């Protein structure tokens, strides 16, 4: 659930990504759900410890999305992921467009370093379009003055993600500047492949 002080963009994001229907996701859902099969949030998650440890736990050096990484590993290994809509916690962010750019830059870096996730589960292109369409509809009904901010934020996310996907073409100081998680870059060295698998 969004925090009580969440702005309209944060409210919509929570409602869009965390629905009211309980789901059990498995390999069989990849065709229909794509990358949403492995979408989850560590802000309110539990893992079966034996499986978590058997699959190697979280990666040692990832910029973010360790929850998606682990979910993808579990689905690949034949396990299922449960989303329990009845359980609830308040978690949201009133990010500025700059902060959204930084977060999506880091998301792009994550996928550039872990291309196997999009290769095996698909990209987020269609889901991104569906999100933007839903957001505009939500704002038209509830907070129309936020539409310009939403459009700016969408552009910031798109640009950040695209730059993050090509982080190896950028100077390291630029990557650190663009990133929300700046300490990640302290131990990065360029190589022909940064895939973590």
Residue ranges and their predicted role:
Residues 77-101, 110-115:
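Active-site donor/metal-binding and catalytic loop motifs
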Residues 12-28:
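Short, flexible helix-coil linker/hinge segments at the edges of structured domains or between repeats
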Residues 26-50, 62-63, 69, 111, ...:
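A recurrent flexible, glycine/aromatic-enriched loop bordering the glycosyltransferase active site
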Residues 1-12:
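Conserved donor NDP-sugar-binding/catalytic core segment of glycosyltransferases
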Residues 56, 93, 104:
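Short, flexible helix/strand-to-coil boundary loops that buttress conserved ligand/catalytic motifs
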Residues 45-47, 51-56, 61-88:
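A short, conserved alpha-helix in the catalytic core of glycosyltransferases
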Residues 4-5, 70, 92-93, 122:
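Short secondary-structure boundary/hinge segments and terminal tails
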Residues 106, 113, 120-197:
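Non-catalytic, C-terminal membrane-associated alpha-helical segments of glycosyltransferases
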């Amino acid at each position: 659930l969004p925090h009580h002080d969440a702005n309209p963009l944060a409210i919509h994001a929570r409602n869009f990504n965390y629905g009211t229907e309980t789901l059990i996701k498995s390999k069989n859902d990849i065709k229909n759900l794509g990358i949403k099969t492995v979408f989850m949030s560590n802000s309110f998650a539990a893992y079966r410890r034996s499986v978590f440890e058997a699959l190697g736990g979280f990666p040692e050096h990832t910029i973010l999305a360790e929850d998606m990484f682990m979910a993808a590993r579990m689905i690949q290994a034949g396990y299922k992921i449960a989303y329990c809509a009845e359980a609830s916690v308040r978690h949201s962010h009133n990010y500025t467009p700059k902060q959204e750019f930084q977060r999506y830059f880091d998301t792009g870096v994550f996928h550039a370093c872990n291309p196997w996730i999009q290769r095996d589960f698909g990209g987020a292109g269609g889901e991104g379009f569906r999100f933007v369409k839903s957001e505009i509809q939500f704002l038209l009904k509830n907070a129309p003055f936020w539409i310009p901010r939403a459009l700016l934020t969408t552009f910031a996310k798109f640009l950040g993600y695209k730059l993050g996907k090509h982080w190896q073409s950028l100077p390291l100081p630029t990557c650190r500047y663009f990133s929300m998680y700046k300490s990640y870059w302290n131990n990065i060295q360029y190589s022909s492949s940064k895939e973590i698998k």
